[in-house]
Amino acid sequence: MGHGDDLIIADTNFPSDSVARETVLGELLRIDAPAAEVVKAVLSVYPLDTFVEDSAGRMEVVGEPNSILPVMSEVQSEVSAVGGPNPMISIERYAFYERAKKAYAVIQTGERRFYGCFAFRKGVIGPEEN
């Protein structure tokens, strides 16, 4: 997984298995935890791309693109904690599916709340400091 690759973190309702088969990895990864916990863990080792404005995105509520649900707020807090974009971009449902199919991998979480689906674009890891 390199600079510019996408990682999808999805809720239990997302068609993760079928979408994951179309990704670079080709298989689904699972972490049975709430979305915000998974995002926090991932972002502790996965830098967000600072060269683009869409390095962090959320699936938008159908018909309500500006609606921010609690799960989205929780994940936004984790993104903001690592200096990521605030707010995350809103991605229309079917556009999100298409972005997910082109991703490196999909992680399905144990998140049962609706619209707990997020896309993250990988940045670069700098050299070790001496």
Where on the chain are the PLM-derived regions?
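Ordered, amphipathic secondary-structure segments that act as subunit-interaction surfaces
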Residues: 44-75
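Glycine-rich, aromatic-bearing surface loops/beta-hairpins
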Residues: 63-130
